[in-house]
Amino acid sequence: MLYLHIVPVWLNVCLRISSSVGCLCCLFLKGAAKAWILDKLIQRLRFFMDLSGNKDLLDRELVAFFASRKATPHDTQLALQWVESICQTDKVVISGFHSPLEKEILNYLLERHHPAIFALGRTLYKKVPPYLQTAFDEGNLLFISFRGYSRHTWNSAQQRNWGAADLADEIYFTQFDNTSSLSTLYFALDRYSDKVVRVLE
């Protein structure tokens, strides 16, 4: 379990450094080797998933959404246009729904009874929050927890984001600055993943 806690922290530190000057590990690894290591580390998160809700949603095409806490009105507009287009499809949005804009996207999905996967940065809820109960009862919601954290922390948030990205077929970000942990996630996925990875702009 300790290993699982360390993984997202190590990935963030290592990949952030390698994006600029290179770390000791990354200096000796080619792109394919980095991609293989990244894939193996993230895949391990799947063995620690707890699920509650409609598990069949995992069999659908998943799109991950990540938004910075510093999202601008323009970011919000682009995100709402994006989620509107998603609601015209059978795709399922997976996200931590933690930042203000991510919460707004969740509300949009709930209002339209569109399915979503809520990746938690903590253990599963003992009781479904009232505002999510209808979606849960309708089979439009699945909670995922990557275990080990009784409450939300920075480390658990990183673990949650990496895990959600691993499950997704496509990954979308709003704009972020270089100090954001989303920068590290985007850099790793864009360079070493064969998934669709885009920034809304």
Language model regions located:
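Short loop/turn and low-complexity linker motifs enriched in small/turn-promoting residues
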Residues: 2-3
